[in-house]
């Protein structure tokens, strides 16, 4: 639309000079329609094919001319359209500019009524804007304020409107020296943005403040997805998630110097403070993100309710990904809640340079322990690669196991691992995963099943006796458990794990499918003495110092299913009693 107005002003300027000189004398006596050929010819010289199909009328208050039923097409075919009326008025104060060759245009008002514009976009379908109404009053480029208002209908019934008070000053070379946009009000359907913007020092310095009242982000994303089908609005567990978004930001930008941005983003009533410092001279970007509390329950995807939807945090990393120099982002969150889990005192430090991003630290307190992560993402090659080092220390398993139904564990978890992978989508990344780790659980306890009781019952069965009636504990208390871990693709293997229950050793291996969360556990039980423990049962000498394998399988969070190896049971039952 701006291009069209510039061309129209350029093409109609000779006509305006002619009209102004005789307008007072001849406005009532001369029919303005006689100037149609001159108007259309002047427009053609400016690269506009113009056809005025309606009447042309003089305007006295303010002084100007109105063209009705106007059709136009740019010679390069990039824009075409029509308008019910195009009205241009003259400013008497700048009338002398026609003679003095002053750069100030003598036009004071422009009004467009009910216009329709068809824009040709390269490699895409044309875009039509309709119901365009534009009014610009008291136009000048000498630093005096003037106003504009516009409203239009974009494709897919998107209603756009805007108004503001403008101030523009040009230097002697007709380049912008300063500008201001005050009382800005921009509306796109239900989204309303207000604020001001000021530019100075030849537009090298730009300051301002912008804010948006509460709006529905999901609804806005659905509108955008009509134009960009690849962008799909997320579907979350809580239908009200991301429906109450607001922001306010202040910025002080120096295009070739040091800039700052301070903003507050409210996501469904949860405030996130974001501050940025931009050093253009040294090509450095620093961003700090902080929040008191974030609850992520409602932001889980409907297709995967166990994790937060990445759309919530992905935009925060965009500046670092696009920055052309060194970048750093620090994260401070006092408390992060996901279901019954609470992660506190979260700190993160991410550094980027030349498409290599290093996570030097991501830590937080979790179930009386601490989690620490570090890693690197290399995006310099066609196939991105990454590595992650993690450590978990002193996690209270009794509290952590409450996150899962039918899973009751106790003890203190310590864990360390290194994982590497590469790929350009979720599937290729999963298939490339490789890593190893060490697991230590101090004083592990499994609640709801007593393995010693199971062992004693099996021993009684092997000896041909009924199991003794005892007041067994409902839990299994083990000695410290250690294990080695190996990751290949979506399969996590636990090898060389071992622990002890009284006079009985447990060791073996297991595997977990990370996609289905189904596990297989192969455990070997070895009784080293003839009693399971000082308070336990007598073990048949037949199975003392003899390995007894158990096979367990199931899904995480499901019922624990574990039984001795059938072939060994048959062998023991058929063996002669000692």
Enumerate the predicted regions with their spans.
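Hydrophobic membrane-insertion alpha-helices, especially the h-region
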Residues: 10-25
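Solvent-exposed loop/turn tips at the surfaces of repeat/solenoid architectures
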Residues: 70, 83-86, 110-115, 132, ...
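Terminal hydrophobic membrane-targeting helix
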Residues: 22-110, 550
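Elongated, acidic membrane-bridging lipid-handling scaffolds
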Residues: 90, 99-206, 313-352
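Flexible, surface-exposed loop regions and adjacent strand-edge segments
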Residues: 126, 224-230, 303-306, 452-458
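Hydrophobic residues on conserved beta-strands that form the core of alpha/beta folds
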Residues: 52-53, 67, 83, 107, ...
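Amphipathic hydrophobic-ligand
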Residues: 49-50, 76-90, 123-134, 157-165, ...
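Solvent-exposed beta-strand/coil patches in large extracellular/periplasmic or lumenal scaffold regions
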Residues: 101-104, 112, 145, 236-264, ...
